[in-house]
Amino acid sequence: MFKDNKILILGLARSGYQAAKVLIERGNTVYLNDFKEEDKQDSEQVSELRNIGVNLVFGSHPDDLLDESFDYLIKNPGVPIDHKYVLKARELNIPVINEVEMAYKLLPEGVDIIGITGTNGKTTTTTITYEIMHKAFGDKVHLAGNIGYPLSSILNSVKSGDIIVMECSCQQGENFVDFHPHVGVVTNFSEAHIDFMKTYEHYKNTKSKMFYNQSDNDIAILNHDNSDVLDEMKNISSNKKYFSSKEKIDGCYLVDRDIYYYGDKVMCIDDIKIKGMHNVENVMAAIMAVKEYGVSNEVIFDVVSNFRGVEHRLEYVDTVDGVEYYNDTEATNIKCAQIALSSFNKPTIIFLGGLERGQDFNELTPYMDNVKAIIAIGTCRERVAEYARSIGKDVYVYEHLVDGFDKLKDIVTSGDVVVLSPASASWDQYKECEVRGAEFKQKVHELKGE
């Protein structure tokens, strides 16, 4: 499969770059098209792909590029599902897949996949699961997926008997055909990220596709507390197992402050360093996954008790003059900001705002009890300020995050928490939200004189 074919890759980025290299190695004729001009692409990637024989088309999507001579269209996850090439490919009966599906079909026999999806908590759960599995089984465990490592990038290092821990996004799920994990995990479903998918039903369907590809020999680990997850997964064929932070169930659950796995105490949540009940749930999901491979409680405790979180996700930055600073730039929706605010019981100052998307900030009100001030930033800052005043909170309005730090010295006191949890995307001012988080962290380091 994928030998001596003519293939169009739509979208460069990490996945397009890695897919192109794999396909060229296998003797395919490869075209890669990206709307961005060449001078805005990664020059090293472009040079390498051109040198190995990839036909590169940048700056537009020419109407005559895609025709019936192509055998496959491989779509980058960020490309809309109604893109003209996608629609034309379907008219011409050209299979439309993604990089994950392609790489999955090229994996050696006997490779297990732990696939983790959901609206929130995917990256944290994937990272914890990988670190536990790697501690237990060493280099036979690999990390891949929507966490910065395309599946095709690890093909040459994976052997039969190895295990891949993958984060899977809804955009990837859109073009799954056969892909499925042996152990699948759903952290939760909510309507936070549906803009790419148009409707919530479509969003859930794409998230669920890999589970509907499973057989009764596979495992689906589900959040028992999330009714949308339970409803969406009610007809899957795989063996369903559950975790719950709210009630004692047959699976992984809490009693007082202890996590149990089918009646066996695994650890106390006081030993989990990352903040919030949502992170307890992420740990529980990871426990369920690794227990399918017989990992001991001792290994789980050793990894989890030393895990300090994923960068940019409620990440502890530092304490300066008794004030704790947290970088939660990945909180690009209301639900994530709710989770952040519920994680602290100290007086809190929150940086809130970013790209205007019509967010309903009123949904934050039940979580605002400990908030002493709001610093409104970004293109939606005036609407954030209006909301803050409506609930009687002090608010300070700045276009840019860095300017908000000038006010902090006047309003923080020892014992406070300052958190960047903007409930907004970053594209109004930043290429990606990680840049916003790095800027926040830099300002904290400057406060400390570093």
Language-model segments: residues:
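Short beta-strand "acidic-cap" motif of Rossmann-like dinucleotide-binding folds
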Residues: 30-34, 143, 165, 242, ...
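Residue-level detector of alpha-helix initiation sites
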Residues: 14, 80, 120-124, 280, ...
